[in-house]
């Protein structure tokens, strides 16, 4: 039996997507840490830039706002996507521990609840993937350990 480490660790990642890869990466990192450390949770940080895009992304639209195309996608995928989103939400609710919801204005102070914050995995530093300053952990107020786990970018320099 492993000796459990007594630390509070927060994971800052794209846990809120409706993408199998992103959600499963969040889950895998959570489970790995949870087996070794008491007090692991995914920080329920959802950038405001994502909230406005959630609807059209869930019905399979990118940036195509052709009216005929939008109506067709709504009729074909609307019901399926709302069910899929519910399933993702259910999976997150029952498979990982989430912190209370935080946003840009509360994240800085919320991080002080942790001894360590792990950023990643996935493309958390990619400009095309909603690169948010929060994922760079440039907060001077946070005195805990800052760790990058498999964080990557689609460009050579960030």
Task: Pin down the residues of each PLM region.
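Aromatic- and Gly/Pro-rich donor/ligand-binding loops
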Residues: 11-20, 24-25, 29-157
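Short, Lys/Arg-enriched N-terminal segments with co-localized hydrophobic residues
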Residues: 1-3
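Extreme N-terminal starter segment of soluble prokaryotic enzymes
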Residues: 5-10
């Amino acid at each position: 039996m492993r000796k459990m480490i007594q630390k509070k660790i927060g994971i800052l990642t794209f846990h809120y997507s409706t993408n199998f890869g992103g959600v499963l990466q969040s889950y895998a990192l959570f489970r790995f840490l949870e087996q070794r450390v008491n007090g692991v949770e995914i920080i329920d940080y959802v950038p405001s830039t994502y909230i406005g895009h959630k609807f059209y992304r869930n019905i399979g639209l990118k940036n195509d706002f052709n009216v005929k195309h939008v109506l067709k996608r709504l009729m074909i995928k609307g019901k399926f996507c709302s069910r899929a989103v519910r399933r993702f939400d259910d999976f997150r609710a029952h498979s990982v521990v989430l912190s209370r919801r935080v946003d840009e204005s509360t994240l800085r102070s919320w991080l002080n609840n942790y001894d360590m914050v792990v950023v990643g995995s996935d493309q958390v530093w990619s400009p095309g993937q909603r690169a948010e300053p929060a994922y760079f952990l440039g907060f001077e107020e946070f005195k805990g350990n800052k760790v990058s786990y498999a964080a990557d970018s689609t460009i050579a320099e960030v």
